[in-house]
């Protein structure tokens, strides 16, 4: 077993950080080192891979059954928990200080490339609670980190209170941004955007936000009473805020992951207008055949994500989501239903973590 302060672990973290920053680091050597760490610190993994016949990602359900964490000699610096919308139990993901530092770096660099881009200190409005309100919610943590890193410090804010959305504060911030011609970036859960656009329509409020404004929604509609097509949500955003559909971005993230998958382009390839996600040197989404578990370059299957920014647990995760593979990337198109895929049942039955 590698201890937390082992030079191997410390050096691996440095290599991962360099990979995130775009330095000339061999991705395969980083993945090999992550696999070596996984096999040394999670002995069950070798048996799991033997039984599944490949280096299959561990199922996301493993995080509900137990805390998969490599370093008993290092207390976790932070623990995030799942919402529990996909099952009764709330899963947990533990981060060591090194792991949290890598996650922060991944969130910041990913947002810089895909979301913020050319903007200089935009107003960033969050439709998620603050970290102090929801300390175990990874979306709140990540979106607050983006806001504090890139946003106008005087005007950026969460508009979520204990009783819901503070619409008066939202209107005040947006009116001021329009008056000053300052771009706005709005971040939040997919369903939050739907509810907010609905509420603003009833109030009769809408804006033509300054050029360069954009939105980022995540979380999808798992466990919700209403499913909205991605194109329908983008249309509502355009109608309410004057933001073109090409600037209404979606992101896929999980409590179990340290990184997030952003839209690769504006093509709508999924049955509900989902867009393909962009792979990066430190983050890849692949689709596995639901029965044979082989990778597929085209068509539907199980989504497996390799997130090289994870150093505290296996970096290969079988998400339980259904994906559509294309030349542009993988679109996340829903959850795998019970009994739909041999791969899920096999992975769950093969081993207990």
Identify the residue ranges that each predicted region occupies.
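Active-site glycine/GP-rich loop and adjacent strand/helix microenvironment
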Residues: 1-37, 121-122, 136, 145-353
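Short polybasic/polar patches that bind polyanions
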Residues: 50, 98, 239
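Short acidic, glycine/Ser/Thr-rich loop/turn "cap" segments at secondary-structure junctions
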Residues: 87-97, 120-131, 154-159, 295-296
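"Short basic amphipathic alpha-helical interaction patches in structured regions
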Residues: 92-101, 139-144
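Conserved AMP-binding loop of ANL adenylate-forming enzymes
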Residues: 112-148
């Amino acid at each position: 077993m590698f201890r937390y302060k082992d030079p191997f672990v410390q050096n691996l973290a440095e290599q991962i950080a360099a990979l995130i920053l775009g330095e000339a680091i061999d991705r395969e050597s980083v993945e090999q080192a992550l696999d070596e760490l996984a096999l040394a610190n999670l002995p069950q993994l070798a048996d799991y891979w033997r039984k599944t016949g490949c280096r299959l990602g561990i199922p996301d359900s493993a995080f509900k059954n137990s805390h998969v964490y490599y370093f008993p000699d290092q207390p976790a610096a932070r623990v995030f928990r799942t919402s529990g919308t996909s099952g009764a139990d709330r899963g947990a993901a533990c981060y060591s200080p090194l792991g949290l530092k890598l996650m922060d770096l991944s969130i910041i660099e990913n947002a810089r490339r895909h979301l913020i881009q050319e903007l200089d200190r935009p107003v960033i409005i969050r439709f998620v609670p603050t970290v102090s309100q929801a300390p175990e919610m990874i979306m709140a943590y990540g979106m607050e980190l983006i806001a504090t890193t890139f946003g106008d410090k005087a005007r950026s804010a969460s508009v979520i209170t204990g009783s819901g959305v503070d619409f008066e504060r939202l209107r005040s911030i947006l009116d001021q941004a329009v008056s000053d011609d300052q771009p706005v970036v709005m971040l939040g859960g997919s369903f939050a955007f739907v509810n907010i656009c609905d509420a603003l329509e009833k109030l009769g409020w809408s804006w033509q936000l300054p050029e360069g404004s954009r939105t980022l929604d995540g979380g999808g509609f798992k466990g919700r009473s209403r499913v909205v097509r991605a194109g329908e949500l983008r249309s509502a955003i355009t109608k309410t805020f004057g933001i073109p559909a090409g600037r209404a971005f979606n992101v896929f993230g999980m409590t179990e992951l340290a990184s997030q998958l952003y839209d690769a382009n504006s093509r709508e390839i999924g049955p509900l207008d989902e867009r393909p996600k962009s792979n990066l040197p430190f983050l890849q989404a692949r689709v596995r055949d639901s029965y044979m578990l082989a990778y597929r370059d085209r068509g539907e299957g199980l989504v497996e994500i390799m997130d090289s920014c994870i150093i505290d647990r296996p970096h290969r995760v079988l998400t339980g989501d259904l994906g559509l593979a294309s030349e542009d990337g993988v679109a996340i198109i829903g959850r795998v239903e019970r009994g739909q895929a041999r791969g899920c049942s096999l992975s769950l039955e093969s081993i207990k973590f």
